[in-house]
Amino acid sequence: IRRQRQMCIRDSAYVYFKDDDAPSAIQQLDRFLRAYPNHPNSDYALYLKGLATLNEREGLISSMIRQDISERDAQAARDAFDVFKELVGRYPDSRYAPQATRKMHELVLAQARHQLNTARFYFERKAYIAALNRAKVVLRDFQLTSVSDDAMELMAQCYHELKLFDLEKDMRRVIAVSYTHLTLP
């Protein structure tokens, strides 16, 4: 009976997930993980919880209307990252660890894009200081992502609009050095 109960909780979480009821899926998965923390399928439960936290589904319709992760709720992305990180930390040899690691990389890039999109939003509304601050967050927290080059360019544009031409010139120099460094063999 215990084994059937375990399977029932886990399987109901999957059904909720496939039925686009992420909150119920997460609730069932939390219940499963609390009741059976050392269960052989705990890695799967964590992986499914991470996907449900992002409210992602695999399937034809969801792939056709898939929204960019960076346009979704930033807190949900951070929460999902933490779930995937727990999976990789607790179960590094799990069959789900490579997928969780890939999702973590996607989420870091999405967070960087989210910050950059916010900076662009402020720039378009001529809130140059706010745009500059958001672009600095990208450089500080996500400097190893492909988004950092765009953040530097936006910073240079902000400095120009603020008539801080020395800072703009410095930023353009950094961009040139960064670009040269990246393109050298």
Question: What are these regions, as identified by a protein language model?
Answer:
Residues 18-28, 34-35, 53-83, 122:
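Short coil/linker segments at helix-helix boundaries
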Residues 1-5, 9, 181-185:
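Single conserved hydrophobic/aromatic residue that forms the stacking wall/gate
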Residues 78-91, 159-179:
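TPR/TPR-like (Sel1-like) alpha-helical repeat modules
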